[in-house]
């Protein structure tokens, strides 16, 4: 699979001379021409159908409270179904078009296949930032965008090939439709199909190392597919083998469902069209837009519950992506003493964490001390919610992110001009062997099985206990995810010289909690401060500790399908606290009895 990606990238590079000739902002429109169905390519056949027509006539239940096999239910409230309404994407699109006129057309190949194939992304100078799109084009990755797609050897970079006929492809050979013929296709169940829009490089920019050395690759924008294809998740027979569809289009898990509301054919265990990812915040922004009468034909308060359900599914996906455990922590310590704590975060997803469009996305570990009154003092990974600011000056901060930039310039957010990776500390998936030039930068994940990168990271902290602390103190570690940062949003607003998209994004950002971090996983351990534990108090273990240390910890996060020896402790923070208090009380009673004797 990686060979096909390489061939596809080589072909794309060969087209550069006629595609993009310079990177100056004053140049004329220059479009990226790649294989696949071209603008006007369906002129001899039916155009891509309006997605709302698919939903209203056949594939919509209007019930957000139940698991639904109706494709429109999940799709319409997914980021795929709103790929041309996402305020963050639109703001970034305008900046890209300012920096490299014509580059927006390349983005729109994925974000609105109907608009691109319909010829409405090149029809004027402003078209490549979406100025000439029709209302139906705003539905993003529509039903026909996938269900008329045919297999191609050109993976990635939106090089899709669409059927010029009325036939819709799906998993079933027999359908009962009064609107269109159908045919079975294995392509829709193949992860290579997902590479179409989730393996994206910039044909206009090389990928350079920090010293300016050319890697021979193009600059990566979204490499989720190759992260998967070069991991154990893509290996048949692997204990973790799974396709993109297995995770992001889960099966309902029950018989007797129909994907239509007309002449239904019942299917057993069909797939949902939720396409749940990591962007719960984006879906809640879109829900607010659905409830805003100023958004025109997008205004639909009845659709809001579907977006809230989609956001909840995204949060569930985040919780399944990593596990967190305290591998080492002392069971007792003196007030004011420094203690050593080791936390392990493990990637349980089939790609890097975080993945996808990485500008602004990040995961970090927050470490806090929690006293018996449940007052928390953050000692590493502090996030100021009032300012939407993460303290990156913290010397112990564990931050997992990809930072783009330009050779000779450094870190910057002009996506169309990126040509180097300043930092890439994202967690690899299990068994990951990256493409040349895609290795971690600023982090060492060597030591995985069989020469692969490790899919976990051990974070070591030195924490000084409060001098006034007495009794049980809980060490709490949380893995926190943020889909975008204040700095990135403000950049998109500040640099916009063309339209109001940046300011509109900033307004929506301020009104929606500023993309507050979401806690993916948590682990805790209790330290008795100022009084030793009795010898017969017992211990609580959670997977052991470094150098045989006792670990009274509770771990959370990750999928529910744990293997033996990989189970989170059943004792949560409250249980561990109760245990510690009971042990201390028992010791006090024994001392009292000895004194009475």
Residue ranges and their predicted role:
Residues 593-597:
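Cytoplasmic C-terminal tails of single-pass
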Residues 532-564:
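C-terminal low-complexity, Ser/Thr- and acidic/Pro-rich disordered "stalk" regions positioned immediately N-terminal
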Residues 29-65:
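N-terminal module-boundary/linker segments of secreted carbohydrate-active enzymes
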Residues 13-23, 578-584:
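Bacterial N-terminal signal peptides
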Residues 562-575:
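Juxtamembrane/start-of-transmembrane alpha-helix segments at the extracytoplasmic/lumenal side
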Residues 24-28:
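Sec/Tat signal peptide C-region and signal peptidase I cleavage site
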Residues 30-38, 63-93, 124-443, 449-453, ...:
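Primarily the internal scaffold of c-type cytochrome electron-transfer domains
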Residues 573-591:
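A cross-kingdom C-terminal cell-surface attachment/processing module
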């Amino acid at each position: 699979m990686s060979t096909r990606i390489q061939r596809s990238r080589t072909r794309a590079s060969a087209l550069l001379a006629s595609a993009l000739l310079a990177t100056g902002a004053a140049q004329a429109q220059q479009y990226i021409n790649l294989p696949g169905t071209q603008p006007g390519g369906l002129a001899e056949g039916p155009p891509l159908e309006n997605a709302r027509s698919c939903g209203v006539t056949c594939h919509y239940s209007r019930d957000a409270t139940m698991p639904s096999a109706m494709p429109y239910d999940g799709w319409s409230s997914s980021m795929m179904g709103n790929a041309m309404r996402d305020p963050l994407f639109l703001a970034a699109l305008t900046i890209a078009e300012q920096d490299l006129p014509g580059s927006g057309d390349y983005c729109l190949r994925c974000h609105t296949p109907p608009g691109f194939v319909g010829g409405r992304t090149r029809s004027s100078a402003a078209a490549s930032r979406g100025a000439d799109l029709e209302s139906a084009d705003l539905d993003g990755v529509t039903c026909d965008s996938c269900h008329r797609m045919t297999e191609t050897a050109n993976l990635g970079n939106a090089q899709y090939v669409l059927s010029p006929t009325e036939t819709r492809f799906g998993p079933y050979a027999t359908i009962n439709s009064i609107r269109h013929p159908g045919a079975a296709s294995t392509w829709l169940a193949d992860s290579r199909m997902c590479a179409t829009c989730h393996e994206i490089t910039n044909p206009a920019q090389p990928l350079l190392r920090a010293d300016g050395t050319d890697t021979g690759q193009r600059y990566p924008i979204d490499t989720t597919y190759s992260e998967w294809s070069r991991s154990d998740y893509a290996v048949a027979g692997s204990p973790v083998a799974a396709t993109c569809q297995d995770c992001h289009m889960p099966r309902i898990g029950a018989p007797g469902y129909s994907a239509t509301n007309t002449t239904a054919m019942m299917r057993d265990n069909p797939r949902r069209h939720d396409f749940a990812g990591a962007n719960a915040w984006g879906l809640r922004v879109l829900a607010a837009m659905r409830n805003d009468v100023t958004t025109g034909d997008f205004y639909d308060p009845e659709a809001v519950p579907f977006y809230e359900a989609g956001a909840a599914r995204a949060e569930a996906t985040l919780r399944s992506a990593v596990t967190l455990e305290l591998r080492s922590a002392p069971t007792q310590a003196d007030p004011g003493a420094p203690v050593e704590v080791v936390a392990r975060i493990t990637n349980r997803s089939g790609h890097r964490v975080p993945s996808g469009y990485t500008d602004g996305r990040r995961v970090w570990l927050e470490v806090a001390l929690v006293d018996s009154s449940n007052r928390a003092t953050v000692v590493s990974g502090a996030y100021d919610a009032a300012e939407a600011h993460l303290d990156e000056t913290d010397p112990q901060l564990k931050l997992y992110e990809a930072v783009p930039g330009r050779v000779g310039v450094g870190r910057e957010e002009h996506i169309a001009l990126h040509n180097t990776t300043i930092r890439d500390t994202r967690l690899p998936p299990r068994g990951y062997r990256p493409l040349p030039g895609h290795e971690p930068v600023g982090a060492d994940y060597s030591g995985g099985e069989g020469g692969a990168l490790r899919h976990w990271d051990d974070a070591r902290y030195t924490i000084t206990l409060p001098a006034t602390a007495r009794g049980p103190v809980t060490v709490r570690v949380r893995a926190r995810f943020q889909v975008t940062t204040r700095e990135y949003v403000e950049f998109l607003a500040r640099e916009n010289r063309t339209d109001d998209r940046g300011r509109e994004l900033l307004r929506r950002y301020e009104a929606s909690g500023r993309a507050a971090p979401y806690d993916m996983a948590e682990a805790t351990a209790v330290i008795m401060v100022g009084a030793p534990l009795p010898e017969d108090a017992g211990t609580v273990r959670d997977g052991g500790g470094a150098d045989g240390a006792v670990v009274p910890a509770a771990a959370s996060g990750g999928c529910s399908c744990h293997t033996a020896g990989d189970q989170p402790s059943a004792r949560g923070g409250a249980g561990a606290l109760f245990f510690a208090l009971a042990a201390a009380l028992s010791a006090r009673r024994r001392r009292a009895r000895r004194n009475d004797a």
